[in-house]
Amino acid sequence: MATDALSIARDLVRCPSVTPADAGALGVLEKLLGDAGFEVHRVTFSEPGAADIDNLYARIGATGPHIAFAGHTDVVPPGDESAWTHGAFSGEVKDGFLYGRGTVDMKGGIACSAAATLEYLEAHGGRPGKDGNGSISFLITGDEEDIAVNGTVKLMQWAAARGEKFDHCVLGEPSNVAELGDCIKIGRRGSQSGTLYVEGVQGHVAYPHRASNPIPDIAALITALVSEPLDQGSAQFQPSNLAFTSVDVGNPANNVIPGQARAKFNVRFNDHHNQESLRALIEARVAKVSGNRIRTRIVWEPSNADVFVTRPGPFTDLVVAAIEEVTGRRPELNTGGGTSDARFIKDYCPVIEFGLVGQTMHQIDERAPVADLEKLTRIYHGVLDRYFA
């Protein structure tokens, strides 16, 4: 079995592992890491109303320091496969690019971390760390692109229950914006969704005095919520953002004043807030506008996406040094973008995200330069060299 990053990535891409299907992807890693001396566990998690999902945990070494590589082998659907210039699951290499769904997000990153680890172990007698003291592990899920209830969140709980302790983690998500080495994600904003309801009184449009139209009221509330900033940002985060995503009254008739209006919204929030304080702030602003005249309520959706940041320090410094050595670029330490599985890992150890360039992820003809796969492998190898120095 070939152990270079390109070969591993091609093997993974050829597995059509659209969530919740595994399609053999974890088996590729199970054999690869098992042959290298890792203790490998396949763990299946269940949740009512959701598909059972396979996950993989692999570790070599029994002592600290302990560094983990994390990732997901599941991918989003390819869309119209006839629109791809190369098969969505072909793993074809053309003109210096590897094509296929998941190449960037994030089978390529997993392949590079695996290849780098195998190279490192080969150069150090098959054991991590000085004199064999240290551990390297892989935390790989098949449930990230969908509802993420049977993936990393439960894999971390399972690992902790069996006594696994992690010192640091690298999540190989496509963190770079334009060029390999331009960005490390050291945190993520929190995410909270909700639905604002405004109650009115249904009636005939010809007799408005007998009705109470909730539409002007919900419009006033929406305007108030989006016109006043939630905050001005912080040292590590951009300002929090509240965005309305739909407004509806469920009224197909043009001669009926609706009895209720509702608006869905999402907030991406920074470290000025947690879920409880954010909810309280929004509810207070709604109450200020509503007074005793407008009847409102907010239904909050459950959220497992709290804000977090890994403070810059020795670990981020060594990752930056490894990136600079290979690319000549000093990466920005960034907290932008959406949520990731780092939100589950941060409760167990400091975590940073660094992988490929994310420009084509989730797109038709998703692809990564072969040269970037080679460079990312060298970067991860450099991280291991410095980590166990």
Curated annotation (Swiss-Prot):
A molecular function GO annotation: acetylornithine deacetylase activity
Binding annotation for Zn(2+) 2: D105, E145, H362
Textual note on the cofactor: Binds 2 Zn(2+) or Co(2+) ions per subunit.
InterPro entries: ArgE/DapE_CS, Bact_exopeptidase_dim_dom, DapE_proteobac, Peptidase_M20, Peptidase_M20_dimer, Peptidase_M20A
Pathway: Amino-acid biosynthesis; L-lysine biosynthesis via DAP pathway; LL-2,6-diaminopimelate from (S)-tetrahydrodipicolinate (succinylase route): step 3/3
Record's keyword terms, sorted: Amino-acid biosynthesis, Cobalt, Diaminopimelate biosynthesis, Hydrolase, Lysine biosynthesis, Metal-binding, Zinc
Entry's EC annotation: 3.5.1.18
Catalytic activity, reaction form: N-succinyl-(2S,6S)-2,6-diaminopimelate + H2O = (2S,6S)-2,6-diaminopimelate + succinate
Cofactor(s), by name: Zn(2+); Co(2+)
Subunit structure: Homodimer.
NCBIfam families per record: dapE_proteo, PRK13009.1
Purpose: Catalyzes the hydrolysis of N-succinyl-L,L-diaminopimelic acid (SDAP), forming succinate and LL-2,6-diaminopimelate (DAP), an intermediate involved in the bacterial biosynthesis of lysine and meso-diaminopimelic acid, an essential component of bacterial cell walls.
Record-given protein name: Succinyl-diaminopimelate desuccinylase
